[in-house]
Amino acid sequence: MSAQDFLVELGTEELPPKALASLGDAFLAGIEKGLQAAGLNYTSKQVYAAPRRLAVLLRQLDVQQPDRSINIDGPPRQAAFDAEGNPTQAALGFAKKCGVELSDIDQSGPKLRFSQHIPGKATASLLPTIVEDSLNDLPIPKRMHWGASREEFVRPTQWLVMLLGDQVVDCTILAQKAGRESRGHRFHHPENVVITTPANYVEDLRKAYVLADFAERRELISKRTAELAMQQEGSAIVPPALLDEVTALVEWPVPLVCSFEERFLEVPQEALITTMQDNQKYFCLLDSEGKLLPRFITVANVESRDPKQIVEGNEKVVRPRLTDAEFFFKQDKKQPLESFNERLKNVVFQAQLGTVFDKAERVSKLAAFIAPYIGGSAANAGRAGLLSKCDLASEMVGEFPEMQGIAGYYYALNDGEPQDVALALNEQYMPRGAGAELPQTLTGAAVAIADKLDTLVGIFGIGMLPTGSKDPYALRRAALGVLRILIEKQLDLDLTTAVEFAVKQFGTKVKAAGLSEQVLEFIFDRLRARYEDEGIDVATYLSVRALKPGSALDFDQRVQAVQAFRKLPEANALAAANKRVSNLLGKAEGAIADQVEPKYFDNANEFSLYSAIQQADQAVQPMASARQYNEALARLAALRDPVDAFFEAVLVNAEDAKVRANRYALLSRLRGLFLGVADISLLG
């Protein structure tokens, strides 16, 4: 079957930059879906996305759809005809369903069968529908109309190129008749560009000052920005999302170095970086110590004969932005940070839970309570908690919401607060996402944990639990944040105690009955997914969860120990034995004695197991107390042989009641040893 290259390019007004790459990928995916359904093959694919165009190039696309045959079985022959050979309703209905006369149905087999040979269509006749369907299925939240057209798209369309080989595919899509004329750069090449063949597409546009390939533009911007930064003895801040957005804004990228007055460096650099990145799409430069340089890189969409004009234009545009940040910073510093709490008394956190100031007071008390348990200062944690929300009422955060916490840090330093108190005002929001940075100070960790626990307890306390994908207060993220801080920072905090303290802070604002247990269950349930992501089996998690440890750090240490235990050759047998023991003890009548009486032993294997348990108990108790869970389980693994021998030779449910009760007591001692670490019966 012969094949030819295929090109489709839809020209538009400037497409949304943040969505450009995803629109291109979706366009290609839709075309691939249509071609697959039509049974058409090709050797390679490429998507192109630039500010004013979406394009797909397929190499060696089949020019003819393959013929195909369909066979549809109908009712059995005996059900299709009556005794006289007349067709029944089943036969007539089958023929009608197939859209043919009964005489066209094959009646020679055990079942009626309709067979049809369908000749393949020319690919050129199928492509318009495939392309149109793909465009209609693009992930566009809001489509628009333009002019007198009734068509809808993300932006008004301007032209359409559709070529199969060197021939134009005759069609009209989104009010544009297909042709071979594309368009070049608005300024460098305002004339139309004739695309002779699909294979020449990229180079034809390159000659017209358009780099159609998104990845090529992105790499060029990244490389040239790094080179210019080195020339300025600095390094560029190039967030991937910003790089993608800038790439989507330009067809012919030309990075240029600009500057601003050094006086602006007195403003917190995070504010300057935020406004330059978010509002102007600039790449900021840092020196070797991570300090902001008074220079930045802009990416022009034109190769100017006088780049100085572009540089000066950008410098002129950014100056008011930086001046605003400077003004807000100076205004905020005119009053102590703590004074902003007065404004927060009128800002509602949650209607049933009070104001943001109320929350700050609760966080202050809870942080002061938590700090000593993790080795921190109660006084500093309490102070940081009280100041934790102050910057939310500042001019700086009002203009730049991303500065919450960061602004508080600078204002606290300006007021002479201790370094760890100032740092905690920013660290309270950590981690800001999965895998993000954790607090570095104990004061910051205490405030971060307190803030998250306060939110969890408060929102759970008024019954606003997260459901499905709805989690408006980010409670799942808060719970994971608490766990990450405690586990990864190796902080041994009893969450049961902390949550109960948090509940008391709310008084009658929440329904306290069962609230602590509900919040703790929610928090520790988050560990299940965390461990699954780490490749730890859910049974390992459940074996520890059954003991309900209050410390996340202790929980993790037990899980890691059980995971290591499961790799031992004795693990499976001991897990099965523990499961058997658990079942037996669960069926025991009456209370099980605490003491084992050797005088009731009548089998040597009972004595052997008892002796092994006694020795293991003496060795394991200190290990468990010191949380040396790996060592404890490794020592308990030695019980496999006496346990196996016991169950092979001893009938637990002996006829003699005292012997039976004593054997239950012996097994209870055995189970208790393992329960000092985890319920390994759940591993079986």
Curated annotation (Swiss-Prot):
GO biological process, one term: glycyl-tRNA aminoacylation
Keywords, ordered alphabetically: Aminoacyl-tRNA synthetase, ATP-binding, Cytoplasm, Ligase, Nucleotide-binding, Protein biosynthesis
An annotated GO cellular component: cytosol
Catalyses which reaction(s): tRNA(Gly) + glycine + ATP = glycyl-tRNA(Gly) + AMP + diphosphate
Name of a matching Pfam family: tRNA_synt_2f
Organism: Pseudomonas entomophila (strain L48)
Broad enzyme group: ligase
The family this protein is said to belong to: Belongs to the class-II aminoacyl-tRNA synthetase family.
One Gene Ontology term of the molecular function aspect: ATP binding
Locations listed in the record: Cytoplasm
Keyword ATP-binding: yes
PANTHER family named in the record: GLYCINE--TRNA LIGASE, CHLOROPLASTIC_MITOCHONDRIAL 2, GLYCYL-TRNA SYNTHETASE
Quaternary organization: Tetramer of two alpha and two beta subunits.
Enzyme Commission identifier(s): 6.1.1.14
Protein name: Glycine--tRNA ligase beta subunit
